[in-house]
């Protein structure tokens, strides 16, 4: 079963959007198999955003993600990575369609509510960074055969 990493960023946590976001993924039929509310260390933030290390906005990314609590999650289901990206909407909320998380709630590129893995490789790497194996549950919902 495909898994992805999603994170409600500090702006989403501060604006009380955790429940709204979780609800959207549950209603889509995806299964939450790991979740935690946490503060992010600078070390974890730098490792998470390592691919952007040479970009001018790297410091701002790290500062923002460490500025307040985040809600880190692991979701599973068929095509969860691609579907989650579509549900999130484009990175820039100006370009994000209404009905997407960013289109409905984000205020700027820098404060765009949510992060999601963009590929199976990213999902595996990010889940491993943010969660121990024991923190990701493995169970089958009885409704799964109808989704």
From Swiss-Prot:
ATP binds at residues 9, 57, 85, 91, 102, 112. GO terms for biological process: CTP biosynthetic process; GTP biosynthetic process; UTP biosynthetic process. It comes from the Bacteria. The active site is at 115 (pros-phosphohistidine intermediate). Its cofactor is Mg(2+). Homotetramer. This is Nucleoside diphosphate kinase. The lineage of its organism: Bacteria, Bacillati, Bacillota, Bacilli, Bacillales. The gene is ndk.
């Amino acid at each position: 079963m495909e898994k992805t990493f999603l994170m409600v960023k500090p702006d989403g946590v501060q604006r009380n959007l955790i429940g709204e976001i979780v609800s959207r993924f549950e209603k889509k039929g995806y299964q939450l198999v790991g979740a935690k509310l946490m503060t992010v260390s600078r070390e974890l933030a730098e490792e998470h955003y390592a691919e952007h290390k040479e970009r001018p906005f790297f410091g701002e990314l790290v500062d923002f993600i460490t500025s307040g609590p985040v809600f880190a999650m692991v979701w599973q289901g068929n095509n969860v990575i691609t579907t989650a990206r579509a549900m999130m909407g484009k990175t820039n909320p100006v370009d994000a369609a209404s009905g997407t998380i960013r289109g409905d709630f984000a205020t700027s590129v820098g404060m765009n509510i949510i992060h999601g893995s963009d590929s199976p490789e990213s999902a595996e790497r990010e889940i491993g960074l943010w969660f121990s194996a024991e923190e990701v549950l493995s169970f089958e919902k009885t409704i799964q055969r109808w989704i």
